């Protein structure tokens, strides 16, 4: 597995492992908050996750949103710009059936990269619109 393939795959495997446990928990907005909280807790148990010069260091929930914070590793040459990394990460997550299910259940994702080299911050939000999920 190449480094470029790793960020989404690691997270997607985490998401797959909890889907069976959580699929009965989320019926709509009220339970979507609980689902987001559990999702963030499960991701947090496996942190840090490193890939391509970036490290996922934090996962937390806020309402129905799972917020993930990624930092660029200082002193390490990244293989992708933060924007390119986020685009690739978004594409991989949106293509995953488990992530699609979570989004369909009302969960949104907010992914932030804090670039320690430049001090810049990059952010992507994953929801029905950005992932192209048509409401049933």
Where are the regions that the model predicts?
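Bacterial N-terminal signal peptides that target proteins for export
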Residues: 2-12
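C-terminal motif of bacterial Sec signal peptides marking the signal peptidase cleavage site
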Residues: 21-24
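Short, intrinsically disordered, charge-biased short linear motifs at domain edges
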Residues: 10-15, 78-84, 115-121
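Short, non-transmembrane amphipathic alpha-helical segments
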Residues: 78-102
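Polar/charged, Gly/Pro-rich intrinsically disordered segments
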Residues: 33-77, 102-136
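Bacterial signal peptide processing site
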Residues: 26-29
């Amino acid at each position: 597995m190449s480094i470029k393939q790793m960020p989404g795959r690691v997270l997607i495997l985490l998401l797959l492992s909890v889907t069976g446990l959580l699929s009965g928990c989320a019926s709509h907005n009220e339970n979507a908050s609980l689902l987001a909280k559990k999702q963030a807790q499960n991701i947090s148990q496996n942190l840090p996750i490193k890939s391509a010069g970036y490290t996922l260091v934090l996962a937390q929930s806020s309402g129905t949103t799972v917020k993930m914070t990624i930092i660029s590793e200082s002193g390490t040459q990244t293989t992708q710009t933060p924007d390119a990394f986020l685009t690739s990460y978004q594409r991989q997550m949106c293509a995953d059936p488990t992530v699609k299910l979570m989004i369909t259940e009302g969960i949104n994702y907010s992914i932030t990269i804090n670039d320690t080299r430049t001090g810049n911050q990059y952010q992507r939000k994953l929801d029905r619109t950005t992932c192209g999920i048509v409401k049933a």
